[in-house]
Amino acid sequence: MKRLIALDMLRGYALVCIMLDHMPLSELRWFTLANFAIFDAAELFVLLSGFLVGMVWLSVETKQGRRAAQWRFARRAFEVWRALVFGGMLMAVVSAGLLALDMDHTAIWHQYAVWVLENPIGFFGVLASMWLQPNLLDVLAVYVILLASVPILVPVLLRHPISFAAGSFVLWCFAPVLNAFVPNHRLGGLLFNPFGWQLLFFSGIAMGLFRKQIIPALMPHRRLLTILSAGMFAFGTTIVIAAKFGEPALPIRDALRLIYGGEIGKWDLDGTRYMAIMGASWLVAVPLAHVMERMAASRLGVALQQIGRGGLFSFLMCVLLSVLGDAFQMNPLGQGIARRMAVDIWAMVALWWISALWLTYGAPWQMSVRFRRETKA
């Protein structure tokens, strides 16, 4: 499978945004995606992950058969679950270490540090059962559920794409009601509603599976689609920017509220957010495709590619670095802009450096271990 450098760059950009967004005192968090789009880096990462799943499935099924593709994503669901469990333990230990050094931080709940020290086995158990999803890692719980469904549902999507899309939409419509029945430590189900976010994830998968059929079919209508997509993105951007102006922009906000209904929830995946990111995906894939390729080939783009290619490992590192960065920016109190900016830059460089090391040493080692296991089997 040929890698798409723009895809890797965007995945890396999403991870950098996620890291900065989780650092409350960050100076650069005011320039992340969420500040000029109605959706944020979490939606971008889930959509791109779905797209990558579709591409990989198609490649593996073509070369090795459907059973191999199903097994690959069943194993991947386990790997994400394992990352959720051990990442949660490690994050709690890091938090406990920071508190022991009298370094306050607000990126994660302090109670995790208490639990991992007082009852590590119990804390491991609630993570392993996914009864508890620590903040910053809670999106992985949804990702586990969605990936676990891939071996069963992707064959259905391939065989009955229209019926699958209709079913996915109906499930999204009832997402808030269904999520309340999911066993969880908090009332109302998982924070990231899997019944809502499946629409975005499987939209990405469909784009990856059928991109060679979809793009040629849509190209005759590219002008209209570009206008509609740009309009949808601009609509969402106007909502976000108008909210920042407060009272002076109240007439504009009231007018916009008549269209979108007054509330745009993230956790159930509001329709406005979904349409905005789908519109943005068309803009990136078609009218801005060459621009994205040039950006991805630049030095900064290559660095973001390396972060994006780190995948799950890079995600865990971005979470841990956001906790450390938050602590460094809070302690001592009253830091100036220059010092907080220095921490932002340190966190981004560290994420890139660790991701590059992983690609150079960690990923090849992981592949060799997997190859030896498959050879013995």
Question: What do the predicted segments below correspond to?
Answer:
Residues 1-377:
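Alpha-helical transmembrane segments and their immediate juxtamembrane cytosolic regions
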